[in-house]
C-alpha cells in the first residue's frame, strides 16, 4: 500500500529531514490513512508486545471505523497522530493525547511510538517526537507531556532523554506479557516558553 501524495492539514507543521536519498515528511495523519495506520500498529503490537498495554488481538478485533475515528481532524479531538512517510509509505507513528478531565487538561501523554525496523537508526523517532512536541505547544493550557517506556529499553529511553524528557518514577510489573511482567519508566517534559522543540 503506497500513498501518491502527502496530506498536510492547514496550520499543521510539516517537518522534513534528509533520509537517505529521499525526504521523510512527518505529518498529522487523517482518516484516509486508517488502513495503513492499523497495519503499522498491528505490526508494532506483534513485534514488541512488552512495549504496549494493548495486545495485537484486542486491536485486531476493532473495526476500521475505530482507527478512522482515532485519526479524526475534528478541532475538538483530544488525540492527534503523526506519521513518518518514506517514499510514499507509512513507516512510523506516534500519538499525543490530551487529558479531558478539568483538573488534568494541562497534561498530555505521548503514546503509540513505533518505527519499522528497516527505517530505524535514521532519526525518524526523533522527528516524530519533535512533531508531537510542536503540536503540544499549540494546545491552550497544555503545560507538560508524559510518557512511559519499557524498563530496559535503553535506546528509547535515550531518545526521550535527548528530547528533553526526565524520569520521575518506575511502575513495577506494569504490563503482563505471557507469564512475565515488565516494568515501565515514567518520564515527563514541561512545555516552557517558546517553541517546544526536541533538543539536538
Task: Mark where each language-model region is.
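Aromatic (phenylalanine/tyrosine) cluster motif
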Residues: 1-3, 19
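Acetyl-CoA-dependent GNAT
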Residues: 31-32, 38-39, 44-112, 116-118, ...
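Conserved GNAT acetyl-CoA-binding A-motif
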Residues: 136-148
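Conserved N-terminal entry element of GNAT/NAT acetyltransferase domains
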Residues: 8-32, 39, 43, 185, ...
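Conserved glycine-rich acetyl-CoA-binding loop
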Residues: 103, 112, 116-130, 139, ...
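Short hydrophobic/aromatic beta-strand or adjacent loop that forms the aromatic wall/cage
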Residues: 79, 182-186
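Conserved catalytic-core motifs of GNAT/GCN5-like acyltransferases
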Residues: 146-149, 161, 166-182
Amino acid at each position: 500500500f503506497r500513498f501518491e501524495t502527502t496530506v498536510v492539514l492547514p496550520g499543521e507543521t510539516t517537518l522534513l529531514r534528509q533520509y537517505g536519498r529521499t525526504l521523510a515528511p512527518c505529518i498529522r495523519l487523517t482518516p484516509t490513512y486508517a488502513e495503513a495506520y492499523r497495519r503499522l500498529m498491528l505490526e508494532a503490537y506483534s513485534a514488541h508486545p512488552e512495549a504496549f498495554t494493548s495486545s495485537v488481538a484486542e486491536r485486531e478485533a476493532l473495526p476500521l471505523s475505530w482507527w478512522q475515528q482515532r485519526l479524526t481532524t475534528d478541532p475538538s479531538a483530544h488525540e492527534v497522530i503523526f506519521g513518518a512517510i518514506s517514499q510514499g509509505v507509512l513507516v512510523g507513528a506516534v500519538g499525543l493525547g490530551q487529558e479531558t478531565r478539568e483538573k488534568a487538561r494541562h497534561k498530555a501523554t505521548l503514546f503509540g511510538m513505533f518505527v519499522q525496523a528497516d527505517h530505524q537508526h535514521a532519526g525518524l523517532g526523533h522527528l516524530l517526537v519533535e512533531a508531537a512536541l510542536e503540536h503540544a505547544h499549540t494546545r491552550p493550557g497544555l503545560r507538560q507531556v508524559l510518557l512511559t517506556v519499557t524498563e530496559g529499553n535503553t535506546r528509547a529511553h535515550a531518545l526521550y532523554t535527548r528530547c528533553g524528557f526526565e524520569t520521575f518514577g518506575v511502575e513495577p510489573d506494569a504490563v503482563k506479557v505471557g507469564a512475565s511482567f515488565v516494568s515501565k519508566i515514567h518520564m515527563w517534559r514541561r512545555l516552557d516558553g517558546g517553541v517546544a522543540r526536541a533538543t539536538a
